[in-house]
């Protein structure tokens, strides 16, 4: 990415941001960038904190690439995303959320098989074959696994057999849809 931008004639200053916003503030004061090319995956070891870094860029009035903090929050919170889908009448599998440190009680509207995953982590973190459960004992075990090992609430939803496809979309008023993969 850096070499391509430089070949196109742009001045580029890569910035490693682990857990210190001061790095960003100092770079902005010293270098005065026109835009921040945001490739941040996590902050302070947590993927869910990336929205806070983007909020910091907004507070500093630095234009940046990628989603705004609200988009990042919506993309991370699977239950909130499902509420937005419901509002727009987009179908999704029935689900329930088990907050951290709570016991699971499966409602009758959620028949097996089910899939259990983190409510907020991405990139399949915590998902394996064991995530697909077909009885209440395995369901309790998997929710405990998500709580104890991933450290988030658990999303339980009806399992749908098949491949999961990703579709990239870019734009606002005029959307560009990228190839499905």
Feature-to-residue mapping (PLM):
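Short, glycine-/small-residue-rich phosphate/pyrophosphate-handling segment
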Residues: 76-96
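Phosphate-binding site of ATP-dependent enzymes
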Residues: 136-181
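Short, hinge-like loop/turn segments at secondary-structure boundaries
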Residues: 30-33, 54-55, 81-86, 110-114, ...
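ATP-grasp fold ATP-binding core
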Residues: 38, 85-86, 110-128, 151-161
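Glycine-rich phosphate-binding loop of ATP-grasp-fold ATP-dependent ligases
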Residues: 94, 114-142, 164
